[in-house]
Structures are given as C-alpha cells and as structure tokens.
C-alpha cells in the first residue's frame, strides 16, 4: 500500500501599515549643516539652495521663540518645492513647536465665518507650556497582596514599596488595584505613581532582580532602585495650544468638542478672558508662550477680507509666524478688480519677507526622482531613470514622479522586479501629461461640450450638432 501524502499550503498576508507614502513623506528636514549652509542633497531636499538657506534663518528665528507676528511668502513656479520647504521646516522644528498647515480654500465654510476659521488657525499655532508641580511616589515594589472577596465585592490589598533609604506599606483601593493589574506590575518592578491622578507608570525592573530571570524580552529595561524619600515633588510641563483652551472653556461638553470637531463659533469674550489669564500665568512664571508656525498653502485663494484680517492679526500679542506659498504671478486679488504681484494686496506684501524658488535643472530632477523611487521601494534601471528625467524636464516633476508607481505595476505584470525603459514608455503612452491633454482637446474640441452647451456628435459627412435654445431653454438638433 502506498501511503497518501498530505500536503499543507500556508498563505501569509502582509498587513498594510498606517504610514502611507505621500508626496512629501521622504522629507525629514531642510538639509542644512550647523552653519545654516544647505547641502546639495540632504534630508530629502534637493537644490533650491538660496530658498533653503533663507528658510534656515526663519527656522532659527522660530527656535529662539522671541520673535512672532512675521509674514513669510514663498513664491515660485509650480513644482519648484514650495510646500516641500515648509514640510522640511516643520520636521526641523520638532513636536515642541506648534505647526499648523492649511490650504487657502479651507477657510470657506458654511458653518464658520472666514474670520473665525482664520482665528482658529492662528490660535492653533500658539503653544502654551504650563508648568505644574505634582507629588509622585517612586520606588521599587517589594510585595503586592490583593484580597479578593468571595461574594465579588470590592478588592482590597497592600503595596510594599521601597527606596534605598526607606520602605513603606500602602493600603490599596479598587482603582489602584486595577491600575497595577493593567500595567502588569510585579515584585521587583520600579514604578512611579502620580498622587493627584493615580496614574501608574512602569519605569523598569530593578538591577537587584536581574538574576531572577533566565530569559527576557528585548523591551525589558533595568533601572537603579530610587534613592531618598518615597514621596517627591516633580515639575511636569503640559503643552497645549490656545485653540484647545478656547474650546474647553467655550462649550458645555468641554474637551469632548476637541474629538468631535464640532467647535462652532467661539465668542471673542471667551478668548479675551483666556488671553488675560495666560498673560497672568506668564508673569507668575507658571506658563511659557511658544510662538509656532501657520503655513497657508495656495494663499492666492484668499479674498481681500481675509488679507485684511491677516494684516491685523499679525500685530496681535499672540501671533505666530505666518508662512504663505503661492505660484501666481501678476494676478487679480480675489474680491477686487485690480491686479497685484502674486495675487496679494500691496500692504500685505510690504509686511512680508519673500523667498523665491527657481525651476530644477536636470541633475536635481534626476536626484529627486531617485529619492522618490527609493521611498516607494521601486528599483529603476539607468535607462529608465534617464527617460524619467527627460520627461520631468519636458513636462513637470509631479508627472514624472507619478509615473514611477504606475511603471512599477506594469513591470510587475511582466514579472520583473525592476522598472525598465519599456515600462516607462508604456506608462507615458497610457497616461497623458497636461500638454498632450491640451493638444487632444484642441484636436477634438468640437466633440466636447463648450461654455454655451454646444456639442457635435459624429465625424466626417454625417454629424449632428446640438445647441441649447437661448429663449425657451429647449434643445435644438441640427443635421449637416
């Protein structure tokens, strides 16, 4: 008898993470050295040396924290790295300095007025460091005794905790027992307990218990047993924005509005009271004001009322540094009939310092495309990269970078791990750039519906033209 062989097939499926590849996910800073000199290529930034050096000076102003209420305009043609400079600036600032990024069209809403949307954006960009002294219990756990009731009542227990100088036994309530169980605290752990909130933080295991375990995970951390008194006073710094304080004090549901997003209109009286209180905290040394950055992309989409509000807001005591980006030349300011540089009123331009960006050359485009391919985990051959660089020069950098992921899918279809020249050519023929799309529209313009509603169906001898009647709104058909 022949034994039947049993074969098993194991399928594994990779889980997609939350960190998706975005347009500027490869940027980790401005690419400057300690002397604010820009590197040719660094931290994901390529070229634009003058603009990056100017942004580095702005970075030092922000980090000093003494200058606020300044306006910076980043102007340049499309696809020259204006938003990338702002993203690099935010990466260099870190999490301590508030950075708010909005688009010019975001402030137009049916629920909020334009000035309220701008005010909230300004207030989000101002941070407040509030200093608070709290009592902490810090020591090494010697023993935990938990008594569970047979009838299912409240648990009771005792916690023996020590430092190098003293040892104390604490009575535990139901809440503290649940906290210790949740943190999986055992004898030999060094813990910290906030007396005000009852929050338990596990700092690590004591060095004296290092030999009690034969095997330990990589996350296991050994620390020294604390010295001195068990109860200590520590200064804790909380960083919040002015907008968060506004929301908490303006609505009945308080901080829950921060999660729902339903902040609504906040009265000016509430903001005035908060400003007065924050000024008092600053004088008493309880709080420190951190001027942040408000980045407004496509700033030419704002109208004259918004620009007037920004002019006034920049003179306020609580004003961040406002960085604006635009790709417009001499164009109309929205809400007016006159033209101005970059679509901004002259009084706001006069208050701004302007950073210009220039188009990339071939070498810079090649380096940027190589960085994007590395970020998207796409392997490009030399010929494919050369063709992509040429496409980026003749069309736009965005179009060339978009072809990378498309070409990868075409390469995978022919079971290849690297993107070659035919893959780039095929994706170039499948997906049009803006210039070829305009040529297509001009060639078949009669077959598209125009502003008057006219369209021609068919070609050559037999064609039907449909027009919209101006007088009674009826459709009319004409046959050639």
Swiss-Prot record:
Cited SMART domains: AAA
Main location: nucleus
Compartments where located: Nucleus
Annotated InterPro entries: AAA+_ATPase, P-loop_NTPase, RuvB-like, RuvB-like_C, RuvBL1/2_DNA/RNA_bd_dom, TIP49_P-loop
MF GO annotations: 3'-5' DNA helicase activity; 5'-3' DNA helicase activity; ATP binding; ATP hydrolysis activity
Domain of life: Eukaryota
EC class (word): hydrolase
Keyword set includes Acyltransferase: no
Residues where ATP binds: 76-83
Record GO cellular component, one term: Swr1 complex
Keyword list, A-Z: Activator, ATP-binding, Chromatin regulator, DNA damage, DNA repair, Helicase, Hydrolase, Nucleotide-binding, Nucleus, rRNA processing, Transcription, Transcription regulation
Reactions mediated catalytically: ATP + H2O = ADP + phosphate + H(+)
GO biological process: box C/D snoRNP assembly; chromatin remodeling; DNA repair; regulation of transcription by RNA polymerase II; rRNA processing
Enzyme Commission number(s) from the entry: 3.6.4.12
Family the UniProt entry places it in: Belongs to the RuvB family.
Function (record text): DNA helicase which participates in several chromatin remodeling complexes, including the SWR1 and the INO80 complexes. The SWR1 complex mediates the ATP-dependent exchange of histone H2A for the H2A variant HZT1 leading to transcriptional regulation of selected genes by chromatin remodeling. The INO80 complex remodels chromatin by shifting nucleosomes and is involved in DNA repair. Also involved in pre-rRNA processing.
Subunit structure: May form heterododecamers with RVB1. Component of the SWR1 chromatin remodeling complex, the INO80 chromatin remodeling complex, and of the R2TP complex.
Protein name according to UniProt: RuvB-like helicase 2
Species for this entry: Debaryomyces hansenii (strain ATCC 36239 / CBS 767 / BCRC 21394 / JCM 1990 / NBRC 0083 / IGC 2968) (Yeast)
Gene name per UniProt: RVB2
């Amino acid at each position: 008898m022949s034994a039947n062989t049993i074969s098993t097939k194991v399928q594994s499926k990779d889980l997609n993470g939350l960190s998706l590849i975005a347009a500027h996910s490869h940027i980790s800073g401005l690419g400057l050295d300690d002397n604010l000199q820009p590197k040719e290529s660094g931290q994901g930034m390529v070229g634009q040396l003058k603009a990056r050096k100017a942004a580095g000076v702005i970075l030092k102003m922000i980090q000093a924290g003494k200058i606020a209420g300044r306006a910076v305009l980043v102007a340049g043609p499309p696809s020259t790295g204006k938003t990338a400079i702002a993203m690099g600036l935010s990466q260099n600032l870190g999490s301590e300095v508030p950075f708010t990024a909005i688009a010019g069209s975001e402030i137009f809403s049916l629920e909020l007025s334009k000035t309220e949307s701008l005010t909230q954006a300004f207030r989000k960009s101002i941070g407040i460091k509030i200093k608070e002294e709290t009592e902490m219990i810090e020591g090494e756990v010697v023993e935990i005794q938990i008594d569970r009731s047979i009838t299912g009542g409240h648990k009771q227990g005792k916690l023996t905790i020590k430092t190098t100088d003293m040892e104390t036994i604490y009575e535990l309530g139901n809440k503290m027992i649940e906290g210790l169980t949740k943190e999986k605290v055992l004898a030999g752990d060094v813990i910290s307990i906030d007396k005000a909130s009852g929050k338990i933080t596990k700092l690590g295991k004591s060095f004296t218990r290092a030999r009690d375990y034969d095997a330990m995970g990589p996350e296991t951390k050994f620390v020294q047993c604390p010295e001195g008194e068990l109860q200590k006073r520590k200064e804790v710094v909380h960083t919040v924005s002015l907008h968060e304080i506004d929301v908490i004090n303006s609505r009945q549901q308080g901080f829950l509005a921060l999660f729902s997003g339903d902040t609504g209109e906040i009265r000016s009286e509430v903001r005035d009271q908060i400003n007065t209180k924050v000024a008092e905290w600053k004088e008493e040394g309880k709080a420190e004001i951190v001027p942040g950055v408000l980045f407004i992309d496509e700033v030419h989409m704002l109208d004259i009322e918004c620009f007037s509000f920004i002019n006034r807001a920049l003179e306020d005591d609580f004003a961040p540094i406002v960085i604006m980006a635009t790709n417009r030349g001499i164009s109309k300011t929205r809400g007016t009939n006159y033209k101005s540089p970059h679509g901004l009123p002259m009084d706001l331009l006069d208050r701004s310092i302007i950073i210009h960006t220039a188009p990339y050359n071939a070498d810079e485009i090649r380096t940027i495309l190589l960085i994007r391919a590395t970020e998207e985990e796409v392997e490009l051959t030399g010929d494919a990269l050369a063709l992509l660089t040429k496409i980026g020069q003749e069309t736009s950098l965005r179009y060339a970078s978009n072809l990378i992921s498309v070409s990868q899918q075409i390469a995978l279809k022919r079971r290849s791990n690297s993107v070659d020249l035919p893959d780039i050519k095929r994706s170039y023929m499948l997906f049009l750039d803006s210039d070829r799309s305009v040529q297509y529209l001009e060639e078949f313009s009669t077959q598209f519906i125009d502003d008057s509603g006219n369209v021609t169906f068919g070609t050559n001898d037999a064609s039907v033209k449909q027009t919209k009647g101006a007088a009674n709104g009826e459709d009319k058909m004409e046959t050639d």
